[in-house]
């Protein structure tokens, strides 16, 4: 997903990953709450018993870290404005070789578009 963003807008790869990560993680977390809770506890030092809440807190903690070190946390932070047409193009380009992408959760066209919308603050 980030390759499409950096390809269209000449965004540095790491910045693009940071801009998409929080939206992707929030979208995928409900499908793998234990995995995100493990990340939150082991990497971000979150001490929360409930896995769902812990995963959410871990995502928020990493996004806050990105902000503290001056990294973008959404597409608009990249000084990039996307609309539905751009979202559609990027999402379709993600699926040129397959009908879904991703390892943790296979993402369909609709999934990809939802993540881009959230990351781009497009309602």
Regions found by a protein language model. Name each.
Residues 1-61:
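Active-site segments that bind and position negatively charged phosphate/pyrophosphate groups
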Residues 36, 43-123:
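C-terminal charged capping/lid subdomain of soluble metabolic enzymes
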């Amino acid at each position: 997903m980030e390759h499409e963003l950096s390809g269209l807008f000449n965004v540095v790869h790491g910045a693009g990953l940071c801009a998409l990560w929080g939206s992707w993680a929030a979208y995928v977390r409900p499908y793998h709450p234990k995995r995100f809770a493990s990340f939150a506890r082991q990497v971000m030092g979150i001490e929360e018993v409930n896995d769902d809440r812990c995963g959410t807190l871990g995502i928020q903690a990493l996004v806050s870290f990105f902000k503290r070190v001056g990294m973008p946390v959404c597409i608009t932070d990249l000084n990039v404005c996307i609309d539905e047409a751009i979202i559609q193009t990027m999402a379709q380009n993600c699926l040129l070789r397959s009908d879904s992408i991703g390892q943790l959760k296979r993402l369909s066209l609709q999934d990809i578009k939802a993540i881009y919308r959230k990351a781009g603050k497009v309602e």
